[in-house]
């Protein structure tokens, strides 16, 4: 599935981060470690080297470990600032999870328009191994981000193709989010994610996933020790659509709130 289920409980999260620059600000080191309920651990580390005003290279590592799942991600990339608005980049990724691993190469362009509107175009290709299955992947995506002092909107469209000896899948994914600060004390966020997967071997859609979510945070400026958080989520997953007798259709409503 393209959309993974999240942990919708409000848990205690501890985060420690470090950022330092060296050699007259040409080298930057950033790292962050977080743990949730002293069980779920995440580690991020990255080094950026600025060769000149236009060209930089970077490498990074990410590690996540949950109760029943872990992942490792290693990246090496470089970026060239073509002008004040356009930058080009390439990136190599090595991903490893419990039952899968991938070697992917990405090529992209970032375009900034009037400072508050940015557009990203990305193409990705590589090899993926899941269990005993090996297949190739190609993906192209377009991401638009619009930012103002009081709100932020992000929309992403992605087309992904996985093909090999045992599968020939097309997947269409859209990811959308909005955040709006109605006042210094109140913020609203919303997300909408949707994906559909088609199997060309049988010329049929085999999976659909949708997730809608709205959340809010209330932290009075005059009483900053008080916090009220809330979230409503609707999830709909349809799997194994190729066989009616074994198809699954899951619909879930989740409401969570917390005050302190």
Q: Where are the language model's segments positioned?
A:
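Gram-negative and organellar
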Residues: 1-260
